[in-house]
From Swiss-Prot:
Residues 12-83 form the S1 motif domain. Keywords: Initiation factor, Protein biosynthesis, RNA-binding. This is Translation initiation factor 2 subunit alpha. InterPro entries: NA-bd_OB-fold (IPR012340), S1_domain (IPR003029), S1_IF2_alpha (IPR044126), TIF2_asu_arc (IPR022964), TIF2_asu_C (IPR024055), TIF2_asu_middle_sf (IPR024054), TIF_2_asu (IPR011488). The keyword Lipid biosynthesis does not apply. NCBIfam families: PRK03987.1-1 (NF003062), PRK03987.1-4 (NF003064), PRK03987.1-6 (NF003066). Pfam families: EIF_2_alpha, S1. One of its GO terms (molecular function) is RNA binding. Heterotrimer composed of an alpha, a beta and a gamma chain. Belongs to the eIF-2-alpha family.
Length: 275
């Protein structure tokens, strides 16, 4: 079970918790990411509506995503709320928790290869990476994208070769793909060749960018579709703007016309394994 580097959660933090004991006035839950820490959820924080029977909402052994509303480390008190968690926040926290589980499994594999126990791995690798990146899997993703040297100085050097091997094999580089369409016309006998040359030049220029891939698809005159895959949305938009400027310039100089068309809800996130 992945655990956080901090001893106590912070107010406003979302946590994964397991219901341990239920009473008429509330429930006690164990914090999965904070071993040995127990929290209390008052019945008024279980649901937005009036709760007649708390057991209609909570069961022993049930895992929930809750929001930390009060923390008193001196007394060891932690208060949680279920009603203050939206569906979107719950989904995001569960995704984060799954990423932490994956990071933990990969670190266990690395520790095994080095002949170290997980407590040592947690202390030497997990804690410094979480403190620097916020979550360990994000550090692994950066290493997959930019090279293992991004971890240098944060973890002991002896970990780097084995972490590189594991990250290369198991960690996918997150990417974003956006698409758009161009309407291009060049009223000349060689208009098709001019358009083709403009698209090829724009594509090849963009593909020189690190971790960027551009693809054109002919949809039928005068429409052409462009797909841009990049490390993040902002980079993809930057590349699209650059390509559009290049195509519009070349086509205009050739006496033609080019228009960039954007469609709503055509942005999607994908994952591409690092080659």
């Amino acid at each position: 079970m992945p655990r956080r580097a901090r001893e106590y959660p912070e107010e406003g933090e979302f946590v994964v918790a397991t219901v341990k004991r239920i009473h008429n006035y509330g429930a006690f839950l164990e914090l999965d990411e904070y071993p040995g820490k127990e929290a209390f959820m008052h019945i008024s924080e279980v649901a937005s509506t009036w709760v007649r029977n708390i057991r209609d909402y909570l069961k022993e052994g049930q895992k929930v995503v809750a929001k930390v509303i009060r923390v008193d480390p001196r007394k060891g008190h932690i208060d949680l709320s279920l009603r203050r968690v939206t569906q979107q926040q719950r989904k995001a926290k569960l995704q984060e928790f799954k990423r932490a589980q994956k990071a933990e499994n990969l670190l266990k594999l690395a520790a095994e290869k080095l002949g170290k126990d997980f407590e040592t791995a947690w202390r030497e690798v997990w804690v410094p990476l979480e403190e620097e990146w916020g979550e360990v899997y994000a550090a692994f993703e950066d290493a997959a994208k930019d090279g293992i040297d991004v971890l240098k100085g944060h973890v002991p050097d002896e970990w780097l070769p084995v972490l590189k091997e594991i990250i290369d094999n198991y960690v996918e580089v997150p990417t974003v793909t956006i698409d758009a369409e161009f309407e291009i016309t060049v009223p000349k006998p060689n208009g098709v060749e001019i358009i083709k040359e403009a698209l090829i030049r724009a594509r090849d220029r963009a593909n020189k960018e690190k971790d960027v891939e551009v693809k054109f698809t002919y949809l039928g005159a005068p429409r052409y579709r462009i797909d841009i895959t990049a490390p993040d949305y902002y980079k993809a938009e930057e590349v699209l703007e650059s390509i559009a400027e290049e195509i519009l310039r070349v086509i205009k100089e050739a006496g033609g016309e080019a228009t960039l068309l954007r469609k709503e809800k055509r942005i999607k996130k994908v994952k591409k394994r690092k080659k």
